[in-house]
Amino acid sequence: MGLNTAIATRVNGTPPPEVPIAGIELGSLDFWALDDDVRDGAFATLRREAPISFWPTIELPGFVAGNGHWALTKNDDVFYASRHPDIFSSYPNITINDQTPELAEYFGSMIVLDDPRHQRLRSIVSRAFTPKVVARIEAAVRDRAHRLVSSMIANNPDRQADLVSELAGPLPLQIICDMMGIPKADHQRIFHWTNVILGFGDPDLATDFDEFMQVSADIGAYATALAEDRRVNHHDDLTSSLVEAEVDGERLSSREIASFFILLVVAGNETTRNAITHGVLALSRYPEQRDRWWSDFDGLAPTAVEEIVRWASPVVYMRRTLTQDIELRGTKMAAGDKVSLWYCSANRDESKFADPWTFDLARNPNPHLGFGGGGAHFCLGANLARREIRVAFDELRRQMPDVVATEEPARLLSQFIHGIKTLPVTWS
């Protein structure tokens, strides 16, 4: 099926280049501008030579960097930290920079809280993400995906398009906007806002802290206005659930609703977008895996989706803060220290995956930590993300089975999100 404009295929299972430890600098944006192969090689070196190491915080304009952090790179350690929130606390922040009052205004949601309050807040919306409820919206997901792929074909008679703007971006965005009750006319605004929030630091998206804070205020004000409307006009949507919920006998404040809203639309959009895009890139590089999946789509879909999430590792890391002194692998860390959990590294750990460099759509077992390491903060939207990924690839298989990337992706300059800004594709 080869299209002559496709990017170069690769030999599946090829390990990344060796990167000496002296060439690794997690605390520099220059390191995060390097391509994925170098990044993978760097983390392989860290797992082998310095599985726990200390790094300075990247300086971003407007953000308070604060102290450096201990980087956990081994799957077992990331898993352990995820399962012990009493020691590795999500409070006060999940990114390495310090939380400030102005940031907490918009990013103080349940993701930066611990139980019991975290669990009470999570329970408000968790019902909307159960397998049963997600199965109910299957038809809506499929309809959206079908229309997006059909439009992609209709709007591009030259059979050249950007996968991110035409499918991988709009699909999860439209679904989470539907669930939140956001009108279609506002979807593009939401898309822009989430891009700025998660793309801050990338010159193509936003490097002006004032713009970042303005966008945060805009999305917060939008959420508050939508919530105020729902206080009067009940809808069968997640925003109404937030407005009507009681936690510890109290309704959520407008500020709590706004930060909750930001979490759901940002998390519910960016991560799935990048998993789908990395998946198409991987199928382009390893076409034998695509042939294998297309020949038994339903049979392989469950393991294929998990492997795409492992391969993509859309969230690169999360930060925790130690509540007590602890020693891991002979490294002493003190109460109050920042600890970073590197999912991108845990998902390539040679001690956990026999062949971590092989993109294997039938991989089973697959103990990846792409949705977090389990425990209290396991990704709330995992069921929805799996459904969206599966349906997106099913529609590609049906409508443009030989879709292939034509250029290397434009990568997001970010330490936190494994993002792709554009991925040009073609089909016959």
UniProtKB/Swiss-Prot annotation:
EC class (word): oxidoreductase
Reaction(s) the record says it catalyses: a methyl-branched lipid + O2 + 2 reduced ferredoxin [iron-sulfur] cluster + 2 H(+) = an omega-hydroxy-methyl-branched lipid + H2O + 2 oxidized ferredoxin [iron-sulfur] cluster; cholest-4-en-3-one + 6 reduced [2Fe-2S]-[ferredoxin] + 3 O2 + 5 H(+) = (25R)-3-oxocholest-4-en-26-oate + 6 oxidized [2Fe-2S]-[ferredoxin] + 4 H2O
Its EC number(s): 1.14.15.14, 1.14.15.28
Binding residues annotated for heme, in chain numbering: 379
Short name of any one Pfam family annotated for the protein: p450
Cofactors that this protein relies on: heme
Family note: Belongs to the cytochrome P450 family.
Job of this protein: Primarily hydroxylates the omega-carbon of a number of methyl-branched lipids, including (2E,6E)-farnesol, phytanate, geranylgeraniol, 15-methylpalmitate and (2E,6E)-farnesyl diphosphate. Also catalyzes the sequential oxidation of the terminal methyl of cholest-4-en-3-one into (25R)-26-hydroxycholest-4-en-3-one (alcohol), (25R)-26-oxocholest-4-en-3-one (aldehyde), to finally yield the carboxylic acid (25R)-3-oxocholest-4-en-26-oate. Also able to sequentially oxidize cholesterol itself, not only cholest-4-en-3-one.
The protein's name in its UniProt record: Methyl-branched lipid omega-hydroxylase
Organism per entry: Mycobacterium tuberculosis (strain CDC 1551 / Oshkosh)
Organismal lineage: Bacteria, Bacillati, Actinomycetota, Actinomycetes, Mycobacteriales
